[in-house]
């Protein structure tokens, strides 16, 4: 049975003093041995973390006791292994970066559509269905008949809208993303641009996969996630994709057979994009990873500090032994 609980959460809320939350939140996560990253900004909180069920329950309870963070939106999935290496709480300008000033989902946002009602909506021929995620995410899975804006980052989405969507022509627009947060901003942006009927999938793809049976589903493929699982299938279990440690792109087993694929160094997606300096750096990093594995040690993450401390203590013990031996020799002279 999977014993690691993965929790994706977010909430748009005015947090004028969000900086003061960082240290107590980080301390709470470290004490509970929760790993992953949470983002704090004046507009709210966002992130994905993982830990035991008790630890995640404690985190959600802690957040619920903070002014403004009550009833936070979250989705749970499960894994056999910890999908994160480190524990981080970062301070940001935005909890999801669109880069457009004045977009506030707290003031205006699209109409939420529950997973149970989503199929009927997107089956309407008058509805334009747009995937708000990045191209590499769309490539491994999306909803049937969804439009791929072919963006590399969410910052490019406003330009896609300006060039391809027209409020006078596209009367009904439905959008979706992984957990719902990008759609909060994308629907708010469309409403600001004059689109009247704008809908988005409440809880995102992950909530849809959780609540809709596969035989009734209009989802095709797997869903990319921003952790070491890379992607999840319809049962929210780790999917078939791996990840290139050089460019972080999802890769298939077939792509790993390519001559362009070198573990930790390159893949078909990045072989022509990385410089010789980067390649050398990636080769050295992979060498260090393999060396750590041979010693059964962590290469990155919070466990590295334990490894370093253990080595320091071992060296100190050897130094003390050497000092004692020298003292013994001098005493016998």
Swiss-Prot record:
Belongs to the TrhO family. This is tRNA uridine(34) hydroxylase. Keywords: Oxidoreductase, tRNA processing. InterPro entries: Rhodanese-like_dom, Rhodanese-like_dom_sf, TrhO, TRHO_N. Residues 123-217 form the Rhodanese domain. It comes from Shewanella sp. (strain MR-7). The active site is at residue 177. Coiled coil: none annotated.
